[in-house]
A protein has these predicted regions:
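Non-catalytic accessory regions used for complex assembly or targeting
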Residues: 1-72, 76-85, 104-106, 110-125, ...
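Short, surface-exposed charged micro-motifs
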Residues: 96-100
Length: 136
């Protein structure tokens, strides 16, 4: 699912009062850490599908030569099934980041304590939806 002009606010049951940068104790980075790095370094570069694809490529460590040759085949296989949006990401549920989708569906993340986050929450220019709660 992809959104436009939408802000995903931090989950109501988020355990932090201030955003935290995700860390990993393992060699292989978890999905939310890769999402964080991509969105922090490239705000409004990726839409939902682009983000999923980049995270997949980084997670599977697919070499550039294979991507050059088989990118379409990889995308077709990847998107043959559904993928959760950032409402279900640990970034919005656990680490205290809101996600903004602009009018083209491109995504940027904002710490919950930032002025930008407050502006999205106070303004009427975007639809505000909550991240999914961790507990039911």
């Amino acid at each position: 699912m992809s959104y436009t002009n939408t802000f995903i606010k931090v989950a109501d049951d988020c355990p932090v009062n201030k955003s935290e940068i995700p860390l990993s104790k393992k060699d292989k980075k978890p999905l939310h850490l890769i999402q964080y790095e991509l969105l922090k370094e490239n705000p409004y570069k990726f839409d939902h599908e682009g983000l999923i694809y980049e995270v997949f490529v980084k997670t599977k460590e697919i070499p550039g030569k294979i991507l050059e040759k088989d990118a379409e085949k990889i995308k077709t296989a990847l998107f043959s099934k559904g993928h959760p949006c950032l409402r279900a990401s640990a970034l919005t549920k656990r680490y205290g980041f809101g996600a903004h989708y602009d009018d083209k569906g491109k995504i940027a993340i904002y710490p919950m304590e930032s002025k930008e986050y407050e502006a999205f929450m106070a303004g009427k220019t975007v639809k505000i939806i909550p991240a999914m709660k961790t507990k039911k």
